[in-house]
Amino acid sequence: LVKEKNLESNIHVKTYPFVKNLRYGENPHQKASWYGLNNIGWNAAKQLQGKELSYNNLLDLESALSTILEFEYDQKQNSSENTNAAVILKHNNPCGAALADSPSDAFRKALDCDSTSAFGGIVAFNNNVDLAAAELLSNIFLECVVAPSFDKEALKILHNKKNLRLLQLNKENIKKD
C-alpha cells in the first residue's frame, strides 16, 4: 500500500524466529509465544528448574534485569570492590532493591523494603547466589530467581522448591542496546 500510494513509511518491521510457546499470556486464559534471537538475552538464559515461563514472568524478568544492570553484573568473586545487588519485582513494579557485602544481605535488605509485595515476585542478583542467599530465598514464595550463577549447595536448597523457576543468565549473553 505504501508503494502503491507513493507514500513514505517510517515504519520498520523486524521478524524474529519462534522460540517456544509460553505457559500463558498476560492472563491465564490467553496464549502467548516467544520469538527472539539465538544466544541473546532471555533466549540464552539457562532455565535450571521450574515450570515453563509465562508472558508476565518474561516482563518481570526483563524489568529486574534492567534494574540489576545498574550495578556491575557477574563480578570477579574475589574483587575488593565486589558490590552485591538484589532486586525484587512483582507485576513489573519494584518491591525492593539493595546493595550489600554479600548476596544474602542484599536480598535480606531488598526484602525488608516490602516483604508483602515480594510474595510471588521475581528476584535478580548481579552476582553468584550462594548457600546463605538460597536459604533465605527458600523461605518465601517466589516465581523466578535469575543470577549469573548458583553455587551447587544453593541449587540443592532451591531444588526443593520445584515450581521455582531458576534462570542462569551469563554476562556475555545480555543484549546491549
Task: Annotate each PLM feature.
Residues 1-177:
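Active-site loops and adjacent core secondary-structure elements that bind or stabilize anionic groups
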